[in-house]
Amino acid sequence: MAVSHRLLRPATTTIKNTFSSLFIRSLSSSSSGSSLDPKIDLEEAAAQLGKSSSTSTSPYKGRNFHWVFLGCPGVGKGTYASRLSSLLGVPHIATGDLVREELSSSGLLSSQLKELVNHGKLVPDEFIISLLSKRLQAGKDKGESGYILDGFPRTVTQAEILEGVTNIDLVINLKLREEALLAKCLGRRICSECGGNYNVACIDIKGDDDTPRMYMPPLLPPPNCESKLISRADDTEEVVKERLRIYNKMTQPVEEFYKKRGKLLEFELPGGIPESWARLLRALHLEDDKQSAIA
């Protein structure tokens, strides 16, 4: 892995400067001859971009949300971030998806990343930052404004970089009992043909005096996908437990980072999607006229 470290570990100052430059450009106006002073409120810059280019029909259009989802692997960040993305009319940017896209490519770096991921290791900061910068630039080119980040930041270094170049409005930290979390991760399945995500685990945890019963029904595929389901290579009990251990060790400081800034919302998932989605909307003071249909 010596080659990997040389490829992926430039100086921290260089990382911050490079990402700051790319991030600022990704949110800045593309008007001819204009430039963005880093001291300017980037939300205002994003709002100016959104005025001329956003095509969202969301009732929340124009508010340019800058939100982050935290939570252990498998907790459901993608599920709820995606729903909020549709509701609020802003893109859902999942760094896990960006990594998987890179893993599907060929080359030395891809093979080294596969080794890290398959052993439950977290991808180094600078690689995630590079992928995210490119995604934000692509979004800027398409006229996107606002975003919901899923899977970033995972370290205080990443959080500091992000804080230095944009104003995150809210950080939603999803929580789930470890017993349920492990079962969810081991039950994840993907359709090898359409790419749909499903979960075959039926979670039913008895309650006691301190905790209520938790029931999470399986998210089963349609009949045409049943025979095409596959598991992720890294969804084994050993790898999942190691991934959770590393995550908890590395992200506790991130939670404290945002808690001190008054931006952290702790949200304990009470059960399956219908119950959890309704409660999350109430916690965020949002309304979804279609929630009964999509839950």
From Swiss-Prot:
It catalyses: AMP + ATP = 2 ADP. Keywords: ATP-binding, Chloroplast, Kinase, Nucleotide-binding, Plastid, Transferase, Transit peptide. Residues 187-235 are annotated as: LID. AMP binds at T95, R100, K121, L122, V123, G151, F152, P153, R154, Q158, R243. The keyword tRNA-binding does not apply. Residues 1-46 form a transit peptide. Residues 94-123 are annotated as: NMP. GO terms for molecular function: adenylate kinase activity; ATP binding. ATP binds at G74, V75, G76, K77, G78, T79, R188, G271. SUPFAM superfamilies: P-loop containing nucleoside triphosphate hydrolases (SSF52540). Its EC number is 2.7.4.3. It is found in: Plastid, Chloroplast. GO terms for cellular component: chloroplast. Monomer. Belongs to the adenylate kinase family. Catalyzes the reversible transfer of the terminal phosphate group between ATP and AMP. Plays an important role in cellular energy homeostasis and in adenine nucleotide metabolism. This is Probable adenylate kinase 6, chloroplastic. It comes from Arabidopsis thaliana. The lineage of its organism: Eukaryota, Viridiplantae, Streptophyta, Embryophyta, Tracheophyta.
